[in-house]
């Protein structure tokens, strides 16, 4: 039996579900206020609308009765306590409105929800705190370590709900697996199952699907499912479909998921939310985000109600599709209005969405309200928050979140330590990173490649410590860890900063020999090494290699190239790099022109500087203090004080004044030149006035002594007059 003749012939998924509605979200700008920061918190990267009459993007805060499926508590005592809390909250929040807090406070707890825990204040994140800390030797509650990301935990939860990991004990399933392993080239599994009609049950079919999927025989799973559907009675079950959707999603076979979904039996048992959760998860894993959204919309049309797993998967899907945190929040509100219960995975996805956009304060609000509703944060949520603050270079907040997590009895994972080590590597504190690595091992956590990469980076960022970075690299290889592209990039950068461009290039060649593909960051580090050494030949060679390998450079890459060529007087090559900027869709920045000006000034090409300033104006680039300072020093160097004073005046008018120390030095030079210029001008003016009024003394010419050559005091050459 071939696939062409099977019932899995290509059909349109949309023939069964007329889905035409797409994601449409309102555009208005969203402002939040955080209880931790008394200032407006933006949920959008765009500027706020000037119109004050724009509609609110938030839905109603559910002042009306909840849906029928959710029972409201009838205890009058609880209601009175809630009303008192609401009155206190209203008194505290009269001066501002926080839509997130208002949403959470408006939600009525269901009878199945746990009571709110005691109010816990956030850890105090003080400024100017010490950067050193000590980890407690043990924890209150040794929980199971969770290393996965939020979306991975949702995927695992969905699989456990579907029963994918439930152990089986069946010899029939193993026989089917052996048949799948021993299929010949033109055979299908369905052709080999002629003797299994009365031997296998629907539970054993699910077991066979799981075993074949784990062994990589996904196509055989499709033929086996077709065979199951053709049996009388049919062996196809919602559980089998769920397992198959999960396996197809792993292999990114989204078309088969849609095909199977459109041909589901018209039975009530197949209208199972777990089945549709698996389909949405599989489509999301295949990066078919629009199709995943349409499946979710189809659920409502066939009266399949979403649950908390649906909500968690959908939040992760929207985030991966590039939707903003504002849009994700709207979906969460709508699903909450439908009576979907909240879970740890739902809030973990929300926190991740907000952190990815840099909305850390809003993510903290969500995390705090989550715990007040009885949903405890896990290690993954804290790792997400710590990583967001680390990327913003707020190491004190990272420390505070780590201490708060530890105080709550949560066990740090290897990912937690990697975030901490990366934070201290940014601060160029390798000693603390070494301490973290030892404490990590003492707690039984095995350092991974990222852990050692943070250590290499910490040494590499510190000048003259490339030998320690190389030692950390060798330690990583000694424990059996294979270096990654990031590891080699950190090592190359360490050599580059220390001036060892030969070692940097040797590491680059070793990386290529080991079959590790260099990233754009790796190429940029190698280019930086030769830029520092002034080797324009190697600079050009690496650049051409990048173009051959079709590696798209970043703005940092092009700025490195430009600076390397321009400082060596290769202005034509530097201009070619600027041209490549435009081809890649990258407009030159102020830093780009600052580098060009510095190179032209050092090369004695000060006449080119006003032209570069005009080019900046044509590109709507506003010169900064570095631009003006470069031009002023260039003209002072060639004693063109008139232009130096002119651009100093422009700098002051534009408000682009450098830092106090640099400006004090610049002012001292200009004032000294001004005094010298004033003295010369004063002497010249006095000379002109005296000449006009005839006050200039005439020079008297003395009478020439005709015997001057016979004066005794005149020096004569030795030996000229000899007796």
Swiss-Prot record:
<feature type="repeat" description="PPR 1">
    <location>
        <begin position="272"/>
        <end position="306"/>
    </location>
</feature>
<feature type="repeat" description="PPR 3">
    <location>
        <begin position="343"/>
        <end position="377"/>
    </location>
</feature>
<dbReference type="Pfam" id="PF13812">
    <property type="entry name" value="PPR_3"/>
</dbReference>
<dbReference type="GO" id="GO:0009507">
    <property type="term" value="C:chloroplast"/>
</dbReference>
<feature type="repeat" description="PPR 2">
    <location>
        <begin position="307"/>
        <end position="342"/>
    </location>
</feature>
<feature type="region of interest" description="Disordered">
    <location>
        <begin position="70"/>
        <end position="97"/>
    </location>
</feature>
<feature type="repeat" description="PPR 5">
    <location>
        <begin position="413"/>
        <end position="447"/>
    </location>
</feature>
<feature type="repeat" description="PPR 6">
    <location>
        <begin position="448"/>
        <end position="483"/>
    </location>
</feature>
<comment type="similarity">
    <text>Belongs to the PPR family. P subfamily.</text>
</comment>
<protein>
    <recommendedName>
        <fullName>Pentatricopeptide repeat-containing protein At5g50280, chloroplastic</fullName>
    </recommendedName>
</protein>
<keyword id="KW-0150">Chloroplast</keyword>
<feature type="repeat" description="PPR 4">
    <location>
        <begin position="378"/>
        <end position="412"/>
    </location>
</feature>
<keyword id="KW-0809">Transit peptide</keyword>
<dbReference type="Pfam" id="PF01535">
    <property type="entry name" value="PPR"/>
</dbReference>
<keyword id="KW-0934">Plastid</keyword>
<dbReference type="InterPro" id="IPR011990">
    <property type="entry name" value="TPR-like_helical_dom_sf"/>
</dbReference>
<feature type="repeat" description="PPR 9">
    <location>
        <begin position="554"/>
        <end position="588"/>
    </location>
</feature>
<keyword id="KW-0677">Repeat</keyword>
<dbReference type="Pfam" id="PF13041">
    <property type="entry name" value="PPR_2"/>
</dbReference>
<feature type="repeat" description="PPR 10">
    <location>
        <begin position="589"/>
        <end position="623"/>
    </location>
</feature>
<feature type="compositionally biased region" description="Polar residues">
    <location>
        <begin position="713"/>
        <end position="723"/>
    </location>
</feature>
<feature type="repeat" description="PPR 7">
    <location>
        <begin position="484"/>
        <end position="518"/>
    </location>
</feature>
<dbReference type="InterPro" id="IPR002885">
    <property type="entry name" value="Pentatricopeptide_rpt"/>
</dbReference>
<feature type="repeat" description="PPR 8">
    <location>
        <begin position="519"/>
        <end position="553"/>
    </location>
</feature>
<feature type="repeat" description="PPR 11">
    <location>
        <begin position="624"/>
        <end position="658"/>
    </location>
</feature>
<feature type="transit peptide" description="Chloroplast">
    <location>
        <begin position="1"/>
        <end position="44"/>
    </location>
</feature>
<feature type="region of interest" description="Disordered">
    <location>
        <begin position="700"/>
        <end position="723"/>
    </location>
</feature>
<feature type="compositionally biased region" description="Acidic residues">
    <location>
        <begin position="81"/>
        <end position="97"/>
    </location>
</feature>
